[in-house]
């Protein structure tokens, strides 16, 4: 069986790590005045500078060789053609089909999926235009003014991030709210400022069985019925994005208002599907299509560009260099753009849920590091929060700086200050400051690596390309590590145990460890046979004891 760490290229990279460990990035520039030109590239409205990395020409060449010798070409072709590459769930992975814009068919299990995708796009178009124009009315005959998306994970993070990033394109008479946390204070704070007559709820759940989402959806429906309409009015104020049409209809949602998506769409890759309905409602269907077009453009680049000029591949390989050879444990995402303040959270799920794996596709434990801890926040704020550790701490943290170049009219001075701060930080991380007359506490060692990603402007098209770029970067790393980037069994384990605890909280908890039992006893003091599950269990016991 193939052993990644025993390959000739891997061992060559281990030797290069020893040979280049003491190199300074700034010396690479001194030795090669063309380094910036060589190590930067543009795809559409995105520009990547990867020259400020602790990567010599020899290292980069070996990293590309690593990709050449991997299964990347084969696995990439399999993904785009609808072959089953999510092997643990026996599914194809076809989020790229959701933004496919050509006339060519795309197959999954021998069936062309494009007709259904195009039909759902048309459904999104009709519905979003009806709501935005005011044609869609609530039970009182008033137009919709507030849209509440109820979801969690991929059903929340993607549309939430995109709607906030593209806020300047938002319909002026529509407000958007996102409820994800099962903590009741989250939905309470949203509902208390809304009018049920003018509020539309989108219940976004792949299976229509996600505990957190269903509990929030039931709370929203109860609030709606208590404050306004009757059961028959639910259909005018609740719609769903789900694969489970039957369950959505049982909830009270009209069949024509269940927006389909498919089992081959992973949650963290679902914003291109009907899960992206809030985006279409916010920026309009044309804007939503521009988002898809930008992602599709990045898809074509990923397929067609040679590895040495392939933006997602290069970002993935540089990440592998730091994780597997330099020993970096984390990766910071720092957008110098307030509109992108949700991007670090979105990319955190995309990367950590995809590549947080320790078993390979051959069911063998890996003997090398896989996905990094991804974190970050907006740059200007981050400078006054965690940059101190990045400059002078003992952690080695590669950074992605992200910014858009075009300023908002009237705020040019703000945007110029923002961009100059970003450029200064990238330079400072690389150069450092070491003055022999100063004491060590005043010195910054520098030699800290970073990429800089510049968007011409933060538009739907460029945002789509940016997200697709990171999707493909994560995929490439998963292929090289021989792991399945498209399942999430760790997430499923927690869900299962939560269900077991909920079912047993009022009965037998002896199967759990002593700590869990002790904590449950404290919980019981506040929920003495009063939890919804306990009540249901009690009612079931009573009904079983009755005779008819």
From Swiss-Prot:
GO biological process: gluconeogenesis; glucose 6-phosphate metabolic process; glycolytic process
Pathway entry: Carbohydrate biosynthesis; gluconeogenesis; Carbohydrate degradation; glycolysis; D-glyceraldehyde 3-phosphate and glycerone phosphate from D-glucose: step 2/4
Disulfide bond residue pairs: none
Domain of life: Bacteria
EC number(s) recorded for this UniProt protein: 5.3.1.9
Broad EC category: isomerase
Record field: catalytic activity: alpha-D-glucose 6-phosphate = beta-D-fructose 6-phosphate
Cellular component, GO, one term: cytosol
InterPro entries the UniProt entry points to: G6P_Isomerase, G6P_Isomerase_C, Phosphoglucose_isomerase_CS, SIS_dom_sf, SIS_PGI_1, SIS_PGI_2
Record keywords: Cytoplasm, Gluconeogenesis, Glycolysis, Isomerase
Positions of the catalytic residues: 353, 384, 495
GO molecular function, one term: carbohydrate derivative binding
SUPFAM superfamilies: SIS domain
CDD domains, sorted: SIS_PGI_1, SIS_PGI_2
Annotated compartments: Cytoplasm
Described purpose of this protein according to its UniProt entry: Catalyzes the reversible isomerization of glucose-6-phosphate to fructose-6-phosphate.
UniProt record similarity statement: Belongs to the GPI family.
NCBIfam families (alphabetical): PRK00179.1
Protein name, entry field: Glucose-6-phosphate isomerase 1
UniProt organism field: Chromohalobacter salexigens (strain ATCC BAA-138 / DSM 3043 / CIP 106854 / NCIMB 13768 / 1H11)
């Amino acid at each position: 069986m193939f052993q990644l760490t025993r390959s000739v290229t891997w061992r060559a990279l281990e030797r290069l790590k020893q040979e280049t460990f003491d190199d300074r990035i700034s010396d690479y520039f001194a030795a090669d005045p063309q380094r910036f030109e060589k190590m930067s590239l543009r795809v559409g409205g995105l520009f990547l500078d990867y020259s400020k990395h602790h990567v010599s020409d020899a290292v980069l060449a070996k990293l590309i060789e690593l990709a050449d010798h991997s299964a990347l070409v084969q696995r990439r072709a399999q993904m785009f053609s609808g072959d089953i590459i999510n092997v643990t769930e026996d599914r194809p992975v076809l989020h790229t089909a959701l933004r496919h814009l050509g006339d060519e068919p795309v197959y999954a299990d021998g069936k062309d999926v494009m007709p259904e995708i195009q039909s759902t796009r048309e459904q999104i178009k009709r519905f979003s235009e009806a709501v935005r124009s005011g044609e869609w009315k609530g039970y009182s005959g008033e137009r919709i003014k507030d849209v509440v998306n109820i979801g969690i994970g991929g059903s929340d993070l993607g549309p939430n991030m995109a709607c906030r990033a593209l806020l300047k394109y938002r319909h002026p008479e529509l407000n958007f709210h996102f409820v994800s946390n099962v903590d009741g204070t989250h939905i309470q704070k949203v509902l208390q400022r809304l009018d049920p007559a003018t509020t539309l709820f989108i219940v976004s759940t792949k299976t229509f069985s996600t505990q957190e989402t269903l509990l929030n959806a039931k709370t929203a429906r109860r609030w709606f019925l208590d404050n306004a309409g009757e059961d028959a009015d639910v259909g005018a104020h609740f719609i769903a994005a789900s694969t489970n049409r039957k369950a959505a209809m049982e909830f009270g949602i009209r069949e024509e208002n269940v927006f389909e998506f498919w089992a081959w769409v992973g949650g963290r890759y679902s914003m291109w599907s009907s899960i992206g309905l809030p985006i279409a409602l916010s920026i309009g269907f044309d804007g939503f299509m521009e988002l898809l077009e930008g992602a599709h453009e990045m898809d074509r680049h990923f397929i067609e560009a040679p590895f040495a000029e392939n933006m997602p591949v290069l970002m993935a390989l540089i990440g592998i260099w730091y994780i597997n050879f330099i020993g970096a444990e984390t990766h910071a995402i720092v957008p110098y753009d307030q509109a992108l303040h949700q991007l670090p959270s979105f990319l955190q799920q995309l990367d950590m849920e995809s590549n947080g794996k320790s078993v390979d596709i051959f069911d063998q434990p890996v003997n090398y590091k896989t996905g990094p801890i991804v974190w970050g926040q907006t740059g200007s704020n981050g400078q006054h929060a965690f940059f101190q550790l990045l400059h002078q701490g003992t952690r080695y943290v590669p950074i992605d700086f992200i910014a858009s170049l075009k300023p908002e009219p009237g705020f040019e001075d703000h945007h110029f200050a923002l961009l100059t701060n970003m450029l200064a930080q990238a330079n400072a991380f690389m150069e450092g400051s070491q003055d022999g007359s100063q004491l060590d506490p005043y010195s910054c060692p520098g030699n800290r690596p970073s990429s800089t990603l510049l968007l011409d402007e933060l538009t739907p098209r460029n945002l789509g390309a940016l997200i697709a770029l990171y999707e493909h970067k994560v995929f490439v790393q998963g292929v090289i590590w021989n792991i399945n980037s498209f399942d999430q069994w760790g997430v499923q384990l927690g869900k299962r145990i939560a269900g077991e605890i909920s079912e047993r909280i009022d009965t037998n908890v002896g199967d759990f460890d002593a700590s869990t039992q002790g904590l449950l006893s404290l919980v019981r003091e506040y929920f003495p046979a009063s939890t919804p599950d306990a009540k249901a269990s009690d009612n079931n016991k009573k009904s079983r004891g009755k005779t008819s």
